[in-house]
């Protein structure tokens, strides 16, 4: 997972990409429907704590606040379901899938628990080698991650070539680099293959 329509970017994935030595070959958009799970016989009024992965919590945050329940971040959604089945406490609930409810013999206390129904997560499929594709093929996105120091006009100098060569940037995000606050890392998605003529000129600039 790389980003979600409600919770935004998945920071852990973005941090891992530059050092992974893997190539992005496809993207996949998956509609996410969260469920509020509890042990058999539990009711929402019994719940005091709701556990899930940080993305699950973020995507259901308004619902949790409205219920006035404590949020507890766990390693993943399925693991949260497993944990509450082991705790066997009516005061603990989890945000997870219907499949997790079936596997761990839990009740679904509320279906579609996410804050909005339009909840979509974008996934990247990655592998060691690039696909053999004609560089001039349309409908190709390329992802670029780069690091710059915080100096005047540095971002313009990095990205100006995209404008002058007609390459459309579809996504641009910045986040602090581990080296410190004077270094920024940028995550960029743009249209075109790295070997496309216009893209090559943009990258050379």
Ranges and model annotations:
Residues 2-205:
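Domain-level signature for soluble enzymes in the chorismate/prephenate branch of the shikimate pathway
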């Amino acid at each position: 997972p790389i980003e979600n329509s409600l919770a935004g970017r998945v920071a852990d994935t973005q941090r891992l990409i530059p050092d992974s030595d893997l190539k992005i070959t496809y993207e996949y958009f998956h509609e996410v429907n969260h469920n509020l799970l509890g042990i058999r016989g539990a009711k929402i009024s019994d719940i005091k704590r709701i556990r899930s992965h940080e993305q699950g919590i973020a995507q259901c945050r308004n619902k949790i606040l409205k219920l006035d329940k404590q949020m507890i971040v766990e390693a993943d959604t399925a693991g949260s379901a497993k944990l509450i089945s082991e705790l066997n406490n009516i005061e603990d609930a989890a945000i997870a899938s219907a499949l997790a409810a079936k596997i761990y013999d839990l009740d679904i206390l509320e279906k579609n628990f996410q804050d909005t129904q339009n909840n979509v997560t974008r996934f990247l499929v990655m592998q060691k080698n690039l696909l053999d594709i004609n560089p001039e093929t349309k409908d190709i996105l390329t992802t670029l991650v780069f690091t710059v120091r915080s100096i005047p006009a540095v971002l313009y100098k990095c990205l100006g070539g995209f404008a002058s060569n007609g390459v459309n940037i579809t996504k641009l995000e910045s986040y602090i680099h581990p080296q410190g606050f004077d270094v920024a890392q940028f995550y960029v998605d743009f249209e075109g293959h790295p070997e496309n003529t216009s893209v090559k000129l943009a990258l050379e600039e």
